[in-house]
Amino acid sequence: MSIADVEYEYVVLKINGYDISHLSRYEAVQKFLQSKETLVVEIRRQKHNALDLELKHGSNAKISKVDNPGELSVLTDKSAEGTITAASASQQINCPSSTSLKEIETKTPVVLTLRARSHEDRLGSLQAASKETQTQSVVGTDVLKDNDLVNTITDNFIEHEHHLFEQCLEPEIDIEEVTLVKGVEQSSSNQIGLIVTSSGIQQSSTDTNKGDILGNVLEHSEDVFISGVQPESIAYRDGRLRQGDQILRINGLDVKNQEELETQIARSSTSVTLLVSRILYPEDDDDEDIHFEYANTFLPDDYTNVVDKLDKVLLTHVKSLEELSNKSAMQSDECYHIPEKNSSDSNVKISSLAKNIIEQSTKSCSKIKLRPNANLDYKKKFNLPLSQEEVHLQYEYDESEHIYETIPEDSESEPVYCSPYQRSNDKTSIGCSSPIASRPAESLERTMQQQTQRVAQWLGLKPQYQKTRQTLVGRPPPLKLVQQPTCSRVFTLRSTLTNTSASSSSGVAYSSYGQNNVVTGNAAAPGEEVDNSSSAYNTGDSNNSASPHQNTTNPDEAIATGRKLDSTVIDSPNDHLDATGVSTMLLLPFGKSGRIGLCSSNLPTAYVSERYTNVGSENEIHPLKSDIEILRVKPTDDSYSHCPQFNAPNLSSYHFVSSQEVANRCHISTSLQKNATLLNGESAEEIPMVWKVKRRPDGTRYIVKRPVRNRPQVALRKNMRYNEVTTTEDDTISEVKIGRYWTKEERKRHIERAREKRHHQTQQQQQ
């Protein structure tokens, strides 16, 4: 602990005879706190001064201690020791002590004794501490000089005594008076610039020049705090007011509420005097130590948000793949103009180039998917503009990450359902100009597709490649789009989660794409209803999601258009190769009410061109097959073997449909007992099941399957319960008893009175 003034600086050597020069700051403070008796402190002068030259002759003076006659202090020529006797204080000590102490030779032994009064007296007056000089009565000029020196040093200690106790016995709450003087100029730099707030949430800012109060006062409160200081204002330049200070008084008046404070500040024209209180935390000084480290630290120094890190990695991969794809597109475009006589050489070059591209993309992108338009033949793609060959870069999520949409509490909006993951069943290929190079590209595309499609399809990240089949009762076939619009937006983790949670049930926007802006008909059968509610709580009109295909033209024209497009565009060996378009919303297993869409760079208007393959046209022409064929999972072809089945936990065998649909299907299945089978393999002769919505204790809802209740039996049980005779027996103890309890004798009297009353009534009727 150091005691500093203008001329001298003393360091503490001992406390009650215990050497603290080797202790740390915290341990020295604890020694002060643990001292319950009279505190004796030995100090040493640390600085040289010109007065030392005048004290050479007094080096052999021996000065005794009056208060502690039993303690003998040995004073040598190389040390100047003193004692400060003060009452032990009980206040909390927050003392920034000095570092390692240095012994500096001095020529004068000095003994000082300071007696300090109570803490309240010290706050009332700075001169409250009494001073005593304990010296020997030795006649001589040197001793008188020593007395003058002692008086000077003691005066300096008394002058800075409040500073000493602020350092060592700092109070928990600091009270300070601050005077802010306004300027004459009417500018923003001459404003007080305090933003005050009370116990309410809303804040108000005071402009002291014009007297205008900006903001609203929420409520009256006794406690008014400073919530902020405006930059380049009077309070900001003063530097004494901090955020969190409580304003106790203004211009000598107690602050009652926020409105009164703002009024007083607005009325003051020259200066404002504020009395503020501030809570002092003892650990503030420890926070200034730059070498301080936590023993058990969980976060690294360079810790940032994990989501932001993933986004940065994603954008880096996207940029590298864009350059790679642009380079390959330019080189493949040059190969188109090679003469036919050099076609064999060009094929070899293109194939080697494609292999290099595949190797580079496999190494550089483990999380990014390169997906160009794969369904068009290379001859047809040669005639398309280069802008339509942009790649679609998508983000791959972890295979173990299962994402399920929750059921919203709002009954007016269409609920989002959990659905089992569906595997990829179709072959795709990277669109390159050489048929030789398309084979390894197909394998790469298929491998990447298997890894990325399972979870990302429910977040709207990429389309799902699947066969045309129906998995739900009464649902239309998935729409097949020949041409895929490209997407310029990179779906990062943060933006994807935000778009998923903010998706609405009013449908998705569509846009026209490229040169083929042909709006085709509805893919549903002619006799199919447009209702898209396939939930377990179908309430009729509550599902108001707009169907994206309600603006259809003549179905015959749509069929003709689909056939024409199929005959002109599909020219590849894989006749059944069909790719999805626009977004995953067209392939959701819940029909036409998709909800998550993708943005596209060249989709200017509100509708997208939709062209159907031959499979989609056949589904339009032929009516829906029987329920048994709809519910049965059709066998897969050879292409299915490349895609392993991915079984999602707990939901892989469930298809969420409405209870009315299940009841209707069960009724139909009873009439078709030959080959009737349900989704889970139960026979139609068993008890029919319906979906029920259950509620957990935490408020969340889930769907379970329960047997259909027999309504006549329920009504019969209710009637039997209501027709029971009311008694006081134990079998009806659960019923509510109203009225007093009559004893057995009283009930007998009641029966007799009733009997007499009936007898009297019969007599009157006979007369």
UniProtKB/Swiss-Prot annotation:
Pfam families: PDZ (PF00595)
Gene3D superfamilies registered for this protein in UniProt: 2.30.42.10
Record region (Disordered): 521-557, 744-767
An example Gene Ontology molecular-function term: potassium channel regulator activity
Entry superkingdom: Eukaryota
Biased composition (Basic and acidic residues): 744-755
UniProt domain PDZ: residue ranges: 202-280
Function summary: May selectively reduce calcium-activated potassium channel (Slo) currents by reducing the number of Slo channels in the plasma membrane.
Quaternary data: Interacts with Slo.
Protein name per the record: Slo-interacting protein 1
Gene that specifies this protein: Slip1
